[in-house]
């Protein structure tokens, strides 16, 4: 699967949801559902409400995102 068509954006975690999903507010004001990427899951990266994150959106479904990086 090609990763050339993903859209990377910055966001902030609003709340935790079940099954390692989160409600993320993007920098443009939209609120999306985000799930943790596999590498973050393998390395036990903890994400809490208020954390700044980098998410990847696919152009096919702009209401869901993959959380790929947590900034300090």
Curated annotation (Swiss-Prot):
Record key words, sorted: Cytoplasm, Initiation factor, Protein biosynthesis, RNA-binding, rRNA-binding
GO function terms (MF aspect): ribosome binding; rRNA binding; translation initiation factor activity
Ranges where the S1-like domain occurs: 1-72
Gene Ontology terms: cellular component: cytosol
Pfam families, sorted: eIF-1a (PF01176)
Keyword rRNA-binding part of the UniProt annotation: yes
Function, as annotated: One of the essential components for the initiation of protein synthesis. Stabilizes the binding of IF-2 and IF-3 on the 30S subunit to which N-formylmethionyl-tRNA(fMet) subsequently binds. Helps modulate mRNA selection, yielding the 30S pre-initiation complex (PIC). Upon addition of the 50S ribosomal subunit IF-1, IF-2 and IF-3 are released leaving the mature 70S translation initiation complex.
NCBIfam families referenced in this protein's UniProt entry, alphabetically: infA
Subunit description: Component of the 30S ribosomal translation pre-initiation complex which assembles on the 30S ribosome in the order IF-2 and IF-3, IF-1 and N-formylmethionyl-tRNA(fMet); mRNA recruitment can occur at any time during PIC assembly.
Similarity comment: family membership: Belongs to the IF-1 family.
Protein name: Translation initiation factor IF-1
Organism lineage string: Bacteria, Pseudomonadati, Pseudomonadota, Betaproteobacteria, Burkholderiales
Gene it is expressed from: infA
